[in-house]
């Protein structure tokens, strides 16, 4: 379990089904444009179906047990409000993984998602032993891009037609961090930047709140 104030990340459970489905139901229109979909089968390829909730949890647990994934739900003030998964974990000479997430629209803009991502990045670098974390985001997904912008992720370029999202192959921007870029920890850096941007301006000053470093604004899910 990873905790910072009102934000908690814990392993996803089968008994989360009712709360998970309710959050998804209320956020259908908010989430649909950014959700992964299954492409039509080829004449000789297998026919894939969207998994049930239980099938999804079993798959996530299996991948976690194999060391390839870290699946979490996000709680805010004791309520399930989203999901965050570190997937594609690769060891050997790479020691990397990629992060995907979504969050309830009702808590968007409260710092929940940046805090959750910062918590999991620190966990991956300091406890799990990964060296690099990347987040792939559709260019149109401004709410998600703002998450990595706030956290200071570095933009690395475009992957054309990278993932099948909302019924078609979509381009994604790649954002990344390595352990060397946040020796003091990402959560600590995020707290300082958030405090600085929220502090009152001196009389007579103008301008926008402080934005960390230079990356562009998030993984293919709303935040």
Give the role of each language-model region.
Residues 126-136:
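Conserved GNAT acetyl-CoA-binding A-motif
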Residues 136, 154-171:
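Conserved catalytic-core motifs of GNAT/GCN5-like acyltransferases
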Residues 72, 123-125, 153:
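Conserved hydrophobic/aromatic "anchor" residues
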Residues 78, 111, 141, 167:
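Conserved G/P- and acidic residue-centered "switch" motifs that form tight phosphate/ATP-binding loops
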Residues 14, 139-141:
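A short coil/beta-turn micro-motif at the C-terminal edge
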Residues 101-103, 109-123, 142-150:
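Conserved acetyl-CoA-binding loop-helix of GNAT-fold acetyltransferases
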Residues 1-106, 169-223:
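GNAT-family acyltransferases
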